[in-house]
Amino acid sequence: MNLPRAERPRSTPQRSLRDSDGEDGKIDVLGEEEDEDEVEDEEEEASQKFLEQSLQPGLQVARWGGVALPREHIEGGGPSDPSEFGTEFRAPPRSAAASEDARQPAKPPYSYIALITMAILQSPHKRLTLSGICAFISGRFPYYRRKFPAWQNSIRHNLSLNDCFVKIPREPGHPGKGTYWSLDPASQDMFDNGSFLRRRKRFKRHQLTPGAHLPHPFPLPAAHAALHNPRPGPLLGAPALPQPVPGAYPNTAPGRRPYALLHPHPPRYLLLSAPAYAGAPKKAEGADLATPGTLPVLQPSLGPQPWEEGKGLASPPGGGCISFSIESIMQGVRGAGTGAAQSLSPTAWSYCPLLQRPSSLSDNFAATAAASGGGLRQRLRSHQGRGAGRAPVGRVGAAAVSGGGRGL
């Protein structure tokens, strides 16, 4: 295979230039011509090497950065895929998002409750405002520093919804915006072994009974305690009055009580029945109302009413003792069938402002007896005679009744 030889460069005519002396001189532009034999030998060696490389099966080696390329790529004009160059020329693809993620700090593995607890525990007074908690978290963790406005509402919601955080109002001498937040003392151990990565369980504050944990600086008054006590207490120092004995009031209509209660508890204060008070003479009403500070209808426990004597009311068994006398008030009922209440102790008169002293009661009884007619006077006189030989207390009561009778 004969290859065309490289053409010799044509010799250009030599230019004549004038010397400085004015003489024409010849300048050699091409220089010395190389030997033609040496050039021909080099061309033959290059052609032989080219033939040897073309006859080899497989890959054809080409000088392209020291990398062997397939033959078809050389004939086609170069590689179509840049990945076929090799590892030296392969550049790893890097996007802008990947580079930005590499620079962004990782999110801490702590919950918002753990972050708030960290902030409160590191403060000197163990309390912080919402802005102080956010400042601690932003300064401690760069992740939250970059996303500050987004998680502030989450901190606020966790403070309000979890019982382990307690709101403390500001003191008057410390003005400022926002209230303080602190930890409930019972929630100090809600994290396992002091690690903020895991909580034991959700803390729940126990609801206390209102007023149970607050000590009373002063004892409650006796009247207030008696109103709220379901059982009668020792307000007046006297035992509870028994129920009326069946048969003691034979003429009492069914559904009608012989006395009315002033208090829902067992009878301490007894009132006259409404029909009996309506039938009392007007003179007795004037005598009762004239006494200041007393109630006209307030009387100790009464047996059969004196003005009902004419209606055929049987006298109580055990003698002709009248149940509303001074003696029955001071000493109580002598027999079991009288139906009167037990006597009140002397301390009862000091505790009860509504009850009158025995002396004032005797005056009211005397006025009521004067209005009831002559039959009542005879009963009082007979009772005075029988009470002369009884106990000293009975004599005092009888004397009081007799004194009222003389005034009549």
From Swiss-Prot:
One of its GO terms (molecular function) is DNA-binding transcription factor activity, RNA polymerase II-specific. GO terms for cellular component: chromatin; nucleus. Residues 1-29 have a biased composition (Basic and acidic residues). Residues 30-45 have a biased composition (Acidic residues). It is found in: Nucleus. Residues 1-54, 71-104, 385-408 are annotated as: Disordered. The gene is FOXD4L1. One of its GO terms (biological process) is cell differentiation. CDD domains: FH_FOXD4-like (cd20048). This is Forkhead box protein D4-like 1. Residues 107-201 bind DNA. Residues 389-401 have a biased composition (Low complexity).
